[in-house]
């Protein structure tokens, strides 16, 4: 379990799809390794978000192999994956709490809204009773029966309207959250594809540098 200081360091933030603390940590780690964080930071985040657990290490090694020695490559990739997992534990907990609070607030507002028809209904019944008493058009028994029927119908209508209103609005909230997640995932995928092309170019450039260095070494040996 992460210590309190570690939890604070990986608390969720906006704009990097996982957590502000993790994004900052990853940028610093890549910079220390001599990796272009502007290009590879978002690409690594996309892999951590989209790939299955067992595929993350392989994907990270494929990216960072162009920059790291083989003896340190695996340990650094494991470090990144473990840090990401710690971040997600915190982010998941916060998101669940936020969703519960949002739904609770929504239901509370709905309850306040559906109280108004009940108050209007009581006022109408009082006016009706006063009118009936004034003109004595019905007997006391009929008046009581009418009151009972009106009350039952009003309660049933309010209950149905309340349930429909609650279900509709909760569904709207959940649908909006899903659309937002889908949009972020699509954007991440586009960024992932662009960064993959950049990674291939970097690997090719590195290979060319190695070939040139090898040729220079061979020429030097022939001269000796």
Curated annotation (Swiss-Prot):
**Crosslinked residue numbers (Glycyl lysine isopeptide (Lys-Gly) (interchain with G-Cter in SUMO1)):** 95
The family database entries (InterPro entries) matched by this protein are listed as:
CCDC43 (IPR037666)
Q: What is this protein called?
A: Coiled-coil domain-containing protein 43
Q: Which PANTHER family match?
A: COILED-COIL DOMAIN-CONTAINING PROTEIN 43 (PTHR31684:SF2)
Q: Which organism is it from?
A: Homo sapiens (Human)
Q: Where is the composition biased (Acidic residues)?
A: 138-149
Chain intervals with Basic and acidic residues compositional bias: 176-211
The source's superkingdom equals Eukaryota
Q: Which UniProt keywords apply?
A: Coiled coil, Isopeptide bond, Phosphoprotein, Ubl conjugation
Give start-end positions of Basic residues composition bias: 212-224
Which residue windows are coiled coil? 121-145, 177-218
Q: Where is this region: Disordered?
A: 138-157, 176-224
Instruction: Tell me a GO cellular component.
Output: cytosol
List every position bearing Phosphothreonine: 139
Family, according to the entry, reads as follows:
Belongs to the CCDC43 family.
């Amino acid at each position: 379990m992460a210590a309190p200081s570690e939890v604070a360091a990986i608390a969720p933030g906006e704009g990097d799809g996982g957590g502000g603390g993790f994004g900052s940590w990853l940028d610093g780690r890549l910079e220390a390794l001599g990796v272009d964080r502007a290009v590879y930071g978002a690409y690594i985040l996309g892999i951590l978000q989209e790939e299955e657990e067992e595929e993350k290490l392989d994907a990270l090694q494929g990216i960072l192999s162009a920059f790291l020695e083989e003896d340190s490559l695996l340990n650094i990739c494991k470090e990144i994956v473990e840090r990401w997992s710690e971040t997600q534990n915190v982010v998941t907990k916060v998101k669940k709490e936020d969703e519960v609070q949002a739904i609770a607030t929504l239901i509370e507002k709905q309850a306040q809204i559906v109280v108004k028809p009940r108050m209007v209904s009581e006022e109408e019944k009082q006016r009706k009773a006063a009118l009936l008493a004034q003109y004595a058009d019905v007997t006391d028994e009929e008046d009581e029966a009418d009151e009972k029927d009106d009350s039952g119908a009003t309660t049933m209508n309010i209950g149905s309207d309340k349930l429909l209103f609650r279900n509709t609005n909760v569904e709207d909230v959940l649908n909006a959250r899903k659309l937002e997640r889908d949009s972020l995932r699509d954007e991440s995928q586009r960024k992932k594809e662009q960064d993959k092309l950049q990674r291939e170019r970097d690997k090719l450039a590195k290979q060319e540098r190695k070939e040139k260095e090898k040729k220079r070494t061979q020429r030097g040996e022939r001269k000796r």
